[in-house]
Swiss-Prot record:
PANTHER family the UniProt entry points to: PERIPLASMIC PROTEIN, PERIPLASMIC PROTEIN-RELATED
InterPro entries in UniProt: LprI-like_N
Protein name: Uncharacterized protein R02472
Species the sequence originates in: Rhizobium meliloti (strain 1021)
A family per Pfam: LprI
Annotated family: To E.coli YecT.
Amino acid sequence: MRAAAPALSLLLCCTAPANAQQPEPDCRKAVSQMDLNICADQDYRAADAELNKTYRLVVAAMQATDKELGDIDAAYAGALEALKKAQRAWIGYRDGQCELAGFEARGGSMEPMLVSGCLAELTRKRTAELKELMESAEN
């Protein structure tokens, strides 16, 4: 074991630079496919973060709606469950639709960009739908 320690140290020393992270690309000037893929993924992650923030607000609004309607009659409640059901169905649609979008460049270096672009676009649309729902619930 002691004999292997120097060899292991040398191996770790020599591979550390290879494991270092590459700097983030400037997405306004991205040209290489790798940079375009990274930027598309970043765009999707930002859209997803906004969706999650909006979804939490809509959950709170639907809980308030259920409380208000449930006070009138328990049979009127169910907005939160309907929201959850719709969101689960939407996630299935989004994932399938974006997998399909990737087939335009299946197996190629452009496939991740197409999938991420689709995910970002559909996620932004869903965020807008949820914001509209929340606004209607508040009125």
